């Protein structure tokens, strides 16, 4: 163990954008202020960050995900032990079992319970990830624009069914 938090030094990996830098600086400040832990910021290109994630060359990494469809599975599948996007090395057999079983469960309530249990394991018991933000957008829309739908996941909006009233 470590007897003094000041002896802990971590590096946070992020992309080389101004927004990513500001986010990493907030993390750096909070770790120092609340835990006494020193955090260095390492900014690299997006491509380099992805490569470093895949090879697990980081202590902490700031990354993001926008789900492909409106279902909890679209988030949770990222952390299946042998999953293509599991760049953390996270591994929990019970989590994997729940995700696998949820794919074949036809009772929507039971499936939701399975996914909720998996989420509790991942975020609660194992604390494998710390959500930092939820992306939301604001839109000012002309009242004459009908059937304009804003989506929570994936693309922000789709104009396929939109129509401008007379």
Spans of model-derived segments:
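Detector for C-terminal structural segments
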Residues: 18-30, 50-166
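Acidic/histidine-enriched alpha-helical segments
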Residues: 10, 41-51, 137
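Short, contiguous strand/loop micro-motifs
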Residues: 14-15, 35-37, 85-86
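Surface-exposed acidic, glycine-flexible loop patches that form ligand/cofactor-binding
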Residues: 1-5
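Short, well-ordered beta-strand elements
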Residues: 7-16, 39-42, 59
């Amino acid at each position: 163990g470590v007897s003094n938090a000041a002896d802990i030094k971590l590096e946070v990996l992020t992309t080389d954008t101004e927004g990513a830098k500001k986010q990493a600086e907030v993390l750096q400040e909070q770790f120092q202020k609340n835990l006494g832990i020193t955090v260095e910021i390492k900014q690299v290109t997006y491509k380099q960050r992805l490569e470093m994630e895949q090879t697990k060359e980081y202590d902490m990494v700031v990354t993001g995900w926008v789900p492909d469809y409106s279902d909890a599975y679209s988030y949770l599948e990222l952390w299946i032990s042998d999953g293509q996007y599991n760049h953390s090395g996270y591994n929990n057999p019970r989590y994997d079992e729940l995700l696998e079983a949820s794919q074949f469960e036809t009772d929507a309530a039971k499936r939701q319970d399975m996914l909720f249990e998996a989420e509790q394991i991942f975020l609660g018991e194992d604390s494998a990830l710390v959500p930092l933000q939820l992306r939301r957008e604001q839109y000012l829309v002309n009242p004459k624009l009908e059937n304009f739908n804003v989506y929570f996941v994936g693309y922000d909006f789709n104009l396929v069914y939109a129509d401008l009233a007379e």
